Amino acid sequence: MCRGVQHPLRGIFLRNYLLQCTRNILPDVMVAENEHEVNVYDAIDFVLTNFAEMNKLWVRMQHQGHSSEKTRREKEREELKILVGTNLVRLSQLESATLETYQRLVLPGILEQVVSCRDAIAQEYLMECIIQVFPDEFHLQTLDPFLKSCAQLETGVNVKNIIISLIERLHCLQPEEWQDQRQWHRCHHSR
């Protein structure tokens, strides 16, 4: 049903409703009790798919209507961004999703969608969302793919602000929270 709704605004709200309805029924266990039950990987797949579809609809909104309505459309998109970001919040709330799961499935799925959407407004907002909703430990262990994705963003994206947000988020960590002490030393003494 959700894929059948082609109007971007209606589709976004329908997918947000779907996400809200499934919030308490998505599985949050690493291993299912039997082979017919679902586990956290199914939940991750569901939310990532919903995120990708919502983001496509959100990006498509910029092309709806006459060019004279561009300012109004951008304002609408700005107001709707939180609905798209809710998918990332939901992914971050999955307690069974480990660092390994984040590195292998969650972050690559998100970054692929962010980079491929080729929309500066979406890219900047979603990169900020990633920084804000996922734990510091996850960011420390995935700096390389995150920064590589920053290099692939559209020219209209303020990458400097994204990097500053990430630095501010990680700056407050204590040295024992960094697995590699040399990495902490380089970070704090290279300024």
Regions found by a protein language model. Name each.
Residues M1-R191:
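Long amphipathic alpha-helical scaffold regions
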